[in-house]
A protein has these predicted regions:
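Short beta-strand/loop element within the Bergerat-fold HATPase_c
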Residues: 57-67
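Conserved short strand/loop->alpha-helix "switch" segment adjacent to the catalytic nucleotide/phosphoryl-transfer site
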Residues: 23-42
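Acidic ATP/Mg2+-coordinating residue in the GHKL
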Residues: 75
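Conserved glycine-/histidine-rich ATP-lid loop and adjacent helix of the Bergerat-fold HATPase_c
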Residues: 112-121
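Conserved glycine-rich
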Residues: 56, 121-122
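Short beta-to-alpha transition helix within the HATPase_c
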Residues: 1-14, 18, 42
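Hydrophobic Leu site in an alpha-helix of the histidine kinase catalytic ATPase core
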Residues: 106-110
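Short conserved segment of the HATPase_c
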Residues: 80-93
Length: 149
């Protein structure tokens, strides 16, 4: 999974001034995940949102063991408003409380990313980061499902 995430990040590094920090030190899976366009596109949507809302940095962590694979995407932006968190995953929602109206649209990218990933076995959790100031998206798969894609 690391190779695919790195490929996605490289595409953003070419167009973004933000710093992407990737940690795969706890990625112990040895099996190759089939490159499904739906998974790549879904992850790319969430990395794109992090890039859009981050102030300076996007943190991506990949963890895996013999049971699970997890990707965490965090930014150092303002995080999700309560209004957005209550409706996350619905298309075309906008936060009326977000200061920068040019960045307030949120729904369609998350809706598409969430739908694509969930249809490919992922559990998708969107929340405010527990360790940073911004938003966090947690993507989790059971390895037996990833191997069968």
């Amino acid at each position: 999974m690391f190779d695919y995430v790195r490929e996605i990040i490289k595409s953003f590094e070419n167009i973004s001034k933000k710093e992407f920090i990737i940690n795969n030190s706890q990625d112990t899976n040895s099996f190759k995940v089939t490159k499904l366009i739906e998974i790549i596109y879904g992850i790319r949507n969430f990395v794109g949102n992090a890039n859009k809302f981050a102030k300076k940095k996007i943190y991506i962590s990949i963890k895996s063991d013999n049971q699970m694979t997890e990707i965490s995407i965090e930014d150092d932006g303002n995080g999700y408003s309560k209004e957005v968190l209550n409706k996350i995953g619905e298309p075309y929602i906008k936060s009326s409380s977000y200061d920068d109206k040019s960045k307030s649209g949120l729904g369609l990218g998350i809706f598409i990313g969430k739908t694509l990933l969930e249809r490919n076995g992922a559990k998708v959790i969107c929340r405010n980061s527990k360790t940073r100031s911004g938003a966090e998206v947690l993507l989790t798969w059971k390895n037996k499902e990833l191997k069968n894609l």
